[in-house]
Amino acid sequence: MSTTLLSAFYDIDLLYKNEKVLNNLALSTMLDKKAVGSPVSSTNSNLFPGFLRRHSASNLQALSGNTNPAKFCPNNNQLKEPAAGSTALLNRENKFRDRSFSENGERSQHLLHLQQQQQQKAGAQVNSTRYKTELCRPFEESGACKYGEKCQFAHGFHELRSLTRHPKYKTELCRTFHTIGFCPYGPRCHFIHNAEERRQAPGAGERPKLHHSLSFSGFPNHSLDSPLLESPTSRTPPPQSSSSLYCQELLQLNNNNNPCANNAFTFSGQELGLIAPLAIHTQNPPYCRQPSSSPPLSFQPLRRVSESPVFDAPPSPPDSLSDRDSYLSGSLSSGSLSGSDSPTLDSNRRLPIFSRLSISDD
């Protein structure tokens, strides 16, 4: 009989403990806030219909423990520990079903990392034009560089590269440096700071020489010392024209004719060369040179001033008081020129206009 009583008490105690465990599980499932997505168990959902949630992952694991009551033996602490561990495992497996988890989070971080790498590569490509074109200062001073092989500056002259410059690099003066005496760019400035920095622009050879024509009086300019401004007579001889031949014929006639025949003015050889271009101004002659060693010559073929179209006066009306022919003949025949003396008029001879006036008064 004693054994029967003991077995009865044992069954009552076991039922009490199981009921207590189930009550604790019901309270824990009410406080569970996990997301939906877990399948519903048809066998265990009828036990506690008022306290269970359809899509809770922890409810499935908790109710599955009811099939094996020996697993949840007399201690409540042993029951809570495996339930918590199984819930964590289910949450890890079903994390993609949780609404609070974003699947694009890791992917966006990976894309951001790739973009940063591409930007770094692009930055290295932008600076590739100046890569290894200057010496590394820390390497020159201490012989070591913290960047090592990744340094963008040259570690020695064997790594130094030549930089491609603009065609006008160091060919013009730096306005800022020569105005205020300071340039913020320093040695990297593309303009000239000192005379030794000047370099000749590629393709710019000698400048073309300027060709200057003779002056209006026929004299070449002998004060030009620069080779860029040399006269064209030193490069090519002047072309022979009809006016120059005419000037030479005039000089030959002067050597053969009488110096005193039909001449109103007398010139020396040096002065004849000055007046000859003026005499044939209408034919635009070049400069006719007469050697200074020749004796004084007379310039017979000089035309009268009245015959030259340059010096022709406008026709005067018939009632004018001036007699042009008599005036010119009288004024030209009375003057003489020797050396640098100016022509003088005869004081005893009156001008024709004054003689006309005196006759009209009488």
Swiss-Prot record:
Localization (cell): Nucleus; Cytoplasm
GO process terms (BP): 3'-UTR-mediated mRNA destabilization; cellular response to epidermal growth factor stimulus; cellular response to fibroblast growth factor stimulus; cellular response to glucocorticoid stimulus; cellular response to granulocyte macrophage colony-stimulating factor stimulus; cellular response to transforming growth factor beta stimulus; cellular response to tumor necrosis factor; cranial skeletal system development
Primary subcellular site in the record, as a coarse category: nucleus
Identification of the protein by name: mRNA decay activator protein ZFP36L2
Positions of the UniProt region annotated as Disordered: 100-126, 225-244, 306-362
Region (RNA-binding) location: 147-188
Short sequence motif RNA-binding: positions: 130-135
GO molecular function, one term: zinc ion binding
InterPro entries (UniProt xref): Tis11B_N, ZFP36-like, Znf_CCCH, Znf_CCCH_sf
UniProt cross-references to SUPFAM superfamilies, sorted A to Z: CCCH zinc finger (SSF90229)
Keywords carried by this UniProt record: Cytoplasm, Developmental protein, Metal-binding, Nucleus, Repeat, Ribonucleoprotein, RNA-binding, Zinc, Zinc-finger
Record organism: Xenopus tropicalis
Zinc finger C3H1-type: from-to: 130-158, 168-196
Pfam families reported for this sequence: Tis11B_N, zf-CCCH
Source superkingdom: Eukaryota
Post-translational modifications: Phosphorylated.
